[in-house]
Design a protein with these regions (language model features):
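Long, low-complexity, intrinsically disordered regions
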Residues: 94-99, 167-176, 185, 189-266
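Extended, hydrophobic alpha-helical membrane-active domains that insert into or remodel lipid bilayers
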Residues: 1-192, 202-206
Length: 266
């Protein structure tokens, strides 16, 4: 996953030139970047397990967005502790492997984590109020949240907004009306990330735009369009193995919270 993400960024930087892309991927600074990302991802996963945060975490395993600790499963104090701890860990490892100023790297990491957390919380809130906002309101809200979070993190505002819009537009074709496994949910997040990256490339033509758009689209998918974990657990429990009942309960739930899965329901 790390290599695919880096390859996508490199392809954008080289304007689609395959030979130049392969050349840039073999450079020492690119290798260092990949090694750093892998080291940070592994260390942060260990930190989550040590602190007990892994039991309450939502999301996937991409180090760019991380497994975010949403406040519907944790307190603001826990979220703040985790953001600060992750910033220290990622900046320390980044400085050790790639060099540079620790203070500068820490500021960058802290703002990046704050931006991602803000986006996840915003998408979660938008998902909870989908019935009030409607489709147009959700699209507008996601665009605003994506732009603000990108500004906080120092990313591309245009790319982030494009990614959020792309995730909403692609929603109907990506989802269906059944509760799927965690692996399926992860695949959906990666599809949204890919769609967002392409939208960012078209909108900005820059690597920064591709990264911001991909992150934005993935966060919209994880924390808004998919039913929340507690909701899917409750629906499965009520259905008690009855597939027809499961579909009816999901249909009712989606219409209640205005999740995108309702678009494909009969």
């Amino acid at each position: 996953t790390l290599f695919r993400s880096q390859a996508a960024v490199s392809l954008a930087e080289n304007q689609g030139n395959i030979s130049k892309t392969f050349g840039s991927l073999s450079r020492s600074d690119t290798v260092k970047s990949i090694v750093t990302s892998m080291a940070v991802a592994g260390t942060l996963q260990g930190l989550d397990q040590f602190m007990g945060w892994d039991q309450a975490i939502q999301g996937g395993t991409l180090p760019t967005t991380g497994k975010l600790l949403a406040t519907d499963n944790a307190t603001w104090t826990q979220v703040a502790q985790r953001v600060a701890s992750q910033s220290v860990v990622s900046s320390t490892l980044g400085t050790a492997i790639q060099g540079g100023s620790f203070i500068d790297n820490f500021k960058t990491a802290l703002l990046s984590h704050i931006g991602s957390q803000f986006h996840a919380e915003g998408a979660n809130l938008i998902g909870d109020n989908g019935a009030i906002l409607g489709h147009a309101g959700k699209v507008l809200s996601h665009s605003v949240v994506a732009g603000v979070s990108a500004e906080i993190a120092g990313g591309s505002v245009t790319g982030a907004v494009a990614g959020a819009l792309a995730a909403e537009i692609a929603a109907i074709s990506l989802n269906d009306n059944l509760i799927k496994t965690e692996q399926w949910r992860e695949q959906q997040a990666q599809k949204s990330r890919l769609v967002g990256a392409f939208a960012g490339l078209v909108a900005t033509g820059k690597a920064e735009g591709v990264i911001s758009a991909a992150n934005s689209a993935e966060l919209v998918e994880r924390y808004n369009r998919q039913l929340h974990l507690e909701e899917t657990k409750a629906i499965n429990k009520l259905a008690n193995g009855d597939k027809n009942k499961l579909e009816r309960l999901l249909a009712a739930s989606c219409r209640k919270v205005y999740c995108i899965a309702q678009e494909s329901l009969n």
